[in-house]
């Protein structure tokens, strides 16, 4: 989201519907910036089925596996005239693609990652890419060249410099300043970062807390005598979100039980 992948905001979280922001982006990018808010992912699925979208280019996301209602997602992808998937594995989504563009892992490219504590960290290439694969930035740059938009060769440091020029809270970030531990945005022009974002007040002001009355599920109350246990899934530390990057390792089947339930059934 920092880099503008949301349909209503550009890089730096500026609203794209604002004329002032449209002018800002147009001047920075050298092309006329879109003036309308784009579609969210679920809306894109519906639009694909309605033939309102002809093609989608997906980079590094296995939507068939991670998004709800997989059948609906598959129908949407099969409704497209062109589906381009840029991936490091032949994912469930990639299997539906018209064209697969083989990318590289984080060990095979230079750049930066930003984690959920706003920490921007350097990524240094450890090994060269496998034959036939390219870093994501190189693929995007090559595609721009093919489409007639001349670009210099992809350079991670130049991309970071462009980000720092456009995104205010990246202003003081350079590859050299990131060091081994990185910096937490917002980063001032002198390189000073921000360890704690909200110390005195929230940027957008106070919010309103909404409460909802809890109600027992009728499915449980009507069937709890015959089915006394509830099976639910959860997240674990080792698997990020839907485990698209980790589920290729051997599975370990684990079932967690409350001690009281286990004791009732003599489970030890």
Regions of interest found by a model, annotated:
Residues 160-251:
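Long, low-complexity segments enriched in small/aliphatic residues
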Residues 1-109, 143-151, 188-193, 231, ...:
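Catalytic alpha/large subunits of respiratory electron-transfer oxidoreductases
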Residues 258-261, 265-267:
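Single conserved hydrophobic/aromatic residue that forms the stacking wall/gate
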Residues 112-114, 131-132, 241-244:
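Short conserved micro-motifs at the rims of enzyme active sites and ligand-binding pockets
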Residues 252-257:
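Extended, structured, electrostatic nucleic-acid-contact surfaces
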Residues 37, 41, 70, 113, ...:
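Generic structural signal for well-ordered, non-membrane alpha-helical segments
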Residues 132-182:
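Long, C-terminal catalytic modules of enzymes
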Residues 102-104, 108, 120-129:
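Short beta-alpha connecting loops at secondary-structure transitions
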């Amino acid at each position: 989201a920092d880099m503008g992948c949301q349909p209503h905001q550009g890089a730096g979280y500026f609203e794209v519907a604002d004329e002032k922001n449209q002018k800002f982006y147009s001047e920075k990018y050298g092309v006329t910036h879109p003036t309308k808010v784009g579609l969210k992912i679920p809306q894109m699925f519906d639009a694909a089925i309605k033939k309102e979208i002809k093609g989608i280019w997906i980079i590094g996301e296995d939507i068939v596996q991670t998004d709800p209602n997989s059948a609906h997602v598959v129908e949407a992808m099969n409704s497209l005239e062109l589906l381009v998937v840029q991936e490091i594995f032949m994912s469930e989504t990639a299997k539906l693609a018209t064209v697969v563009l083989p990318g590289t892992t984080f060990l095979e490219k230079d750049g930066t990652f930003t984690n959920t504590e706003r920490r921007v960290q350097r990524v240094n290439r450890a090994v060269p890419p496998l034959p036939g694969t390219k870093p994501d930035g190189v693929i995007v740059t090559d595609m721009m060249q093919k489409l007639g938009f001349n670009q210099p060769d992809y350079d991670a440091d130049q991309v970071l410099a462009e980000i720092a020029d456009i995104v205010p809270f990246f202003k003081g970030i350079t590859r050299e300043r990131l060091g081994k531990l990185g910096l937490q945005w917002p980063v001032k022009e002198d390189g000073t970062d921000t360890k704690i974002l909200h110390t005195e007040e929230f940027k957008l002001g106070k919010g309103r807390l909404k409460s909802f009355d809890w109600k027992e599920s009728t499915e449980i109350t009507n069937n709890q005598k015959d089915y006394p246990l509830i099976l639910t899934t959860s997240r674990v530390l080792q698997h990020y979100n839907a485990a698209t990057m980790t589920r290729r390792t051997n599975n370990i089947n684990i079932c967690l039980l409350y001690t009281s339930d286990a004791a009732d059934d003599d489970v030890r």
